[in-house]
Amino acid sequence: MRQLKGKVKETRKQKKERKLDNLETQAKIRTVVLPALGVLAVFLVLFVYLKTRPAVLA
């Protein structure tokens, strides 16, 4: 028989595993990536604030 072009049909088990993997990936994004971006944003705001504040005359 000839080999048909295109992707192989996904079974129910494979589809369920893929969906579970996607859920795990989304959970990791929420617990790792978003806090890291938050920290970077805080450092950026702090850096800009410190560089643009007026000099204190003593």
UniProtKB/Swiss-Prot annotation:
Give membrane topology per the record: Single-pass membrane protein
Transmembrane segment boundaries: 31-51
The keyword Transmembrane helix belongs to this UniProt entry's keyword annotation: yes
Q: Where in the cell is it found?
A: Membrane
Q: Cite the InterPro entries for this sequence.
A: DUF4519
Q: Which residues form a coiled coil?
A: 1-31
Q: Which GO terms describe its cellular component?
A: membrane
Keyword annotations from UniProtKB, A to Z: Coiled coil, Membrane, Transmembrane, Transmembrane helix
> Where is this chain primarily localised?
membrane
User: What family is it from?
Assistant: Belongs to the SMCO4 family.
Mind telling me what this protein is named?
Single-pass membrane and coiled-coil domain-containing protein 4 homolog
